[in-house]
Amino acid sequence: MGTIHLFRKPQRSFFGKLLQEFRLVAADRRSWKILLFGAINVLCTGFLLMWCSSTNSIALTAYTYLTIFDLFSLITCLISYWVMMRKPSPVYSFGFERLEVLAVFASTVLAQLGALFILKESAERFLEQPEIHTGRLLVGTFVALSFNLFTMLSIRNKPFAYVSEAASTSWLQEHVADLSRSLCGLIPGLSSIFLPRMNPFVLIDLAGAFALCITYMLIEINNYFAVDTASAIAIALMTFGTMYPMSVYSGKVLLQTTPPHVIGQLDKLIREVSTLDGVLEVRNEHFWTLGFGSLAGSVHVRIRRDANEQMVLAHVSNRLCTLVSTLTVQIFKDDWIRPALSSGPVAPNVLNFSDHHVIPMPLLKNVDERTPVTSTPAKPSSPPPEFSFNTPGKNVSPVILLNTQTRPYSLGLNRGHTPYSSVFSQGLAFPGVGAGQGLRPTFPHIPSRYGINRMGQPRP
């Protein structure tokens, strides 16, 4: 028998949790207007679908899909209000802003799928064109146009407003902009109305209604039923062309990419951070788009051992917070320690190598195989990149001395420094050995025996 829990907390189902969150959003006064428009949208969509069936017009069906898209935009607006109410949780430490992006991406993709469905149905109608009844065609056009414009202009939809401005222009906007420039050249007073970038949703609503009006007139005058199919194809292409740039932009945000227009600003800020007092190196910087208009990022900063961590952290955060809203900065102190070398004479028993005093040569990587550790150059006073961030000897294997005694630091040799470029041509150089002398397996400049022998007498 299993353990009996008398006071077990009841587990809510998925729909129970969804209903609880919906009640949380519905309690806000700002969402009442959206819920009212959503109810009217469902009612209008039902009437439009019935009129599409009675008129047998596929062009009106394609235009009705824009009303369904308005319903998705209202749902996205509700999700935006819900995101503002919720705080980050341990599971979702960055918050729920990405749900807005996901809602916009799903809405635009569904609109494009509806446009593809209209194109498929229109291709079938070209083979056998049915008769179109114009009784409710014009009425349905004006009902759908009025509701779409009223919804777009009355509800402040923050996610779609941002995407429509940030995404690239559609081909419909470009053609209308060209016509507007030509018209404003003739009538300059219209420049304040037509020259600014038009709202793509309002533009497609007006263009679709214009196509349906032409369809109604041609069918009433000449019984030219094929124009209904042509109008449906035109509305579907305009819908696809309008939604495609928005879906591409929101998809890039979901893929956690960096917007191209802020890459130059981020590079400038990184260079400014690398010149701050106490900062030796900036590495592993990574920035991505968290939501619409918000960036997140992380960066590793290596500082001097005598630098104040809190002061450097405050300066770095102050520089980057102008662009990056959610920033993680990790501070590392410099771990490069040079041994203190004395300039006195060498003691007679400083080193006691074995009889053969063989030092195995370390394995060195080729210059081509080395990869840069950081994207920002280190300062001249900083240590080499092999000793960065507690990874000493990343590219060079350590040298093992085959004697049992501990090597003292007071060698009494002249302190020199061999640049990294000479390591591959002259052999490995150690700190404390002259700059022009490296250690090789044969040791041509070192006597074969030195120190004291086993009897305590100096060796020759």
Swiss-Prot record:
Membrane side Extracellular: residue ranges:
55-64, 120-134, 222-223
**Places the protein is found:** Golgi apparatus, trans-Golgi network membrane
InterPro entries assigned to the protein according to its UniProt record, in alphabetical order: Cation_efflux (IPR002524), Cation_efflux_TMD_sf (IPR027469), CDF_SLC30A (IPR052005)
- Signal peptide coordinates: none
**UniProt GO molecular function:** zinc ion transmembrane transporter activity
Could you tell me the membrane topology recorded for this protein? Answer: Multi-pass membrane protein
Which GO terms of the cellular component aspect does the record hold?
Answer: cytosol; mitochondrion; trans-Golgi network membrane
Q: Which UniProt keywords apply?
A: Golgi apparatus, Ion transport, Membrane, Transmembrane, Transmembrane helix, Transport, Zinc, Zinc transport
The UniProt transmembrane annotation reads: 34-54, 65-85, 99-119, 135-155, 201-221, 224-244
The record's section on Gene3D superfamilies has: Cation efflux protein transmembrane domain (1.20.1510.10)
Is Lipoprotein tagged as a keyword? no
A single GO BP: Golgi to endosome transport
Tissue occurrence: Expressed in brain and liver, and to a lower extent also in lung. Highly expressed in brain (at protein level).
Q: Which residues lie on this side of the membrane: Cytoplasmic?
A: 1-33, 86-98, 156-200, 245-460
Spell out the residue ranges making up region: Disordered. 371-390
Query: Which Pfam families is this protein grouped with?
Result: Cation_efflux (PF01545)
Q: Do the record's keywords include Iron-sulfur?
A: no
Task: Summarize the protein's role.
Answer: Has probably no intrinsic transporter activity but together with SLC30A5 forms a functional zinc ion:proton antiporter heterodimer, mediating zinc entry into the lumen of organelles along the secretory pathway. As part of that zinc ion:proton antiporter, contributes to zinc ion homeostasis within the early secretory pathway and regulates the activation and folding of enzymes like alkaline phosphatases and enzymes involved in phosphatidylinositol glycan anchor biosynthesis.
Summarize the subunit comment: Heterodimer with SLC30A5; form a functional zinc ion transmembrane transporter.
Q: Which NCBIfam families match?
A: CDF
What is stated as this protein's family in its record? Belongs to the cation diffusion facilitator (CDF) transporter (TC 2.A.4) family. SLC30A subfamily.
Protein known as: Zinc transporter 6
Whose protein is this, by species? Mus musculus
